[in-house]
């Protein structure tokens, strides 16, 4: 192999080309590669954050769903308790009303019974006087013996 001027000229031209590429072409290419690498890394980070955010959102949605179910169950339980309470109150009111009606009826019966007893005493007094009059064959003054008749009626 002969080293001649063309080989040296080609080597110098290649060296100038390499220096030119290193000075003007290589930095934008490296910058573009770094920028692309950064974009890819940012995209991967964003995807990772999105996956974490999705997982957190799903956990939060699940927690809210569980809370809503628990709250619904609590509301249903409160409604059942309130329903039972209303039924118990209605039963108690009905019992009180029945006792009141019963007491009123007993009072009316007692009053009626006392009225009948008084009427019976009065009739018994008249019958006793009439019977005594018939037995004795004489007239007995009812006004004079009213006290005696009242005592007799009270004893009966």
Curated annotation (Swiss-Prot):
Q: Where in the cell is it found?
A: Cell inner membrane
InterPro entries documented for this protein = ATP_synth_B-like_membr_sf (IPR028987), ATP_synth_b/b'su_bac/chlpt (IPR002146), ATP_synth_F0_bsu_bac (IPR005864), ATP_synthase_B_chain (IPR050059)
User: What Pfam families does the annotation carry?
Assistant: ATP-synt_B
Coiled-coil region list: none
As one GO molecular function, the record gives: proton-transporting ATPase activity, rotational mechanism
Q: Origin, by domain of life?
A: Bacteria
Membrane spanning residue stretches: 12-32
Its membrane topology, per UniProt? Single-pass membrane protein
The UniProt entry, under CDD domains, shows: ATP-synt_Fo_b
Mostly located where?
membrane
Keywords (alphabetical) are: ATP synthesis, Cell inner membrane, Cell membrane, CF(0), Hydrogen ion transport, Ion transport, Membrane, Transmembrane, Transmembrane helix, Transport
Q: Which GO terms describe its cellular component?
A: plasma membrane; proton-transporting ATP synthase complex
Q: Which HAMAP family match?
A: ATP_synth_b_bprime
Q: What does this protein do?
A: F(1)F(0) ATP synthase produces ATP from ADP in the presence of a proton or sodium gradient. F-type ATPases consist of two structural domains, F(1) containing the extramembraneous catalytic core and F(0) containing the membrane proton channel, linked together by a central stalk and a peripheral stalk. During catalysis, ATP synthesis in the catalytic domain of F(1) is coupled via a rotary mechanism of the central stalk subunits to proton translocation. Component of the F(0) channel, it forms part of the peripheral stalk, linking F(1) to F(0).
Subunit structure comment from the entry:
F-type ATPases have 2 components, F(1) - the catalytic core - and F(0) - the membrane proton channel. F(1) has five subunits: alpha(3), beta(3), gamma(1), delta(1), epsilon(1). F(0) has three main subunits: a(1), b(2) and c(10-14). The alpha and beta chains form an alternating ring which encloses part of the gamma chain. F(1) is attached to F(0) by a central stalk formed by the gamma and epsilon chains, while a peripheral stalk is formed by the delta and b chains.
Family membership: Belongs to the ATPase B chain family.
| Name used for this protein in its record | ATP synthase subunit b
Q: Which organism is it from?
A: Pseudomonas fluorescens (strain ATCC BAA-477 / NRRL B-23932 / Pf-5)
Q: What is the lineage of its organism?
A: Bacteria, Pseudomonadati, Pseudomonadota, Gammaproteobacteria, Pseudomonadales
